[in-house]
Amino acid sequence: MARQTQSEQLDRIVAGILVRPGTLVRPANNSVAALVRVALELRGLPRPDFKAGLRADLERRTTMATALGRAVNPIREGFHSITPYLILAGAPQWIEFAKQAFGAEERFRVQRPEGGPIMHAEVKIGDSIIELADANPQFPPSMAAMSLRVSDVDAVYDRAIEAGATPIHPPADQDYGCRDASVKDMCGNHWYIFTPLSANSIFEAWRSLTPYLHPLRAPQVIEFAKKAFGAEEVYRAQSPDGVVHHAQVRIGDSIVGMGEAHGPYQPMPCTLHLYVPDADATYERALRAGATSIQPVADQPYGDRSGGVQDPFGNRWFIATHMRDVAPQ
């Protein structure tokens, strides 16, 4: 009998595997044996986990296509691409402070019975919304910095101090085209209150609320935001020694400001609610850019599909796509 080539041996063994899947075959040649192991693995595909993942992905794509076909806005009504989210020790007291200091309007609250912790609340300040909740073991209290655009810096500064805030610096005209002041609220959050002094101010396009970061190194944060969220850098003021004193990036329809940590302005990792057209794709991009998962993407009872990540600098991003309108409960 003529000796079979390696190719002929492999063809014969693969044919046997297909006809009799349970057959144990021991080829004489080691190189053929390695290929047979691959053939045995492939014979078992698609595995159940592969099928389940494929089905879930197809269902998600179908749901999103249906939502897009109905012209559902991927951003929930009243929100922008980015909405700050405060995790507080004493959320009810903070809401009262925001009403007195900033003229805030409470839109929505989910609170445990008998004056228990606030699980979620939404407050409107000017043209923007800020979300908040009482801290819990999973999400302890954290402090954030926020720019607050107003029509009268001095009046808002005075009201904030009267409501219990601590001054950081009093109102003053600045050479970058603003009159500004800053305070710290009772929860430790910084508020940079400002009014543009001219139409050419670099802050002219800012809304009532804009999150402000104080990273140790701003360029790394900017590059992460570009890779993860498609951010566009729109402004950078950098000194000859490389310190970034102020920068702005645009994500969707929103701005995130930042200036590198110095003096009393130290890193304050924040929580941001980010609306995007495809939460799953953005979540995966963020992980590839270096973020770690907090919560996998899933459909939520309030009509969003969302998940969460933490970037390499400690900021938490809850990434969402609005899928359907749900009446508040």
Predicted regions and their residues:
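Vicinal oxygen chelate
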Residues: 70-77, 81-90, 119-124, 135-206, 245, 250, ...
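Charged, compositionally biased N-terminal leader segments and the immediate start
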Residues: 1-21
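Conserved short beta-strand elements that form part of the metal-binding/catalytic scaffold
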Residues: 108-141, 190-195, 234-267, 316-321
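N-terminal beta-strand motif that seeds the catalytic metal site of vicinal oxygen chelate
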Residues: 66-96, 107-108, 143-146, 194-223, ...
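Short alpha-helical interface segments
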Residues: 14-46, 58-69
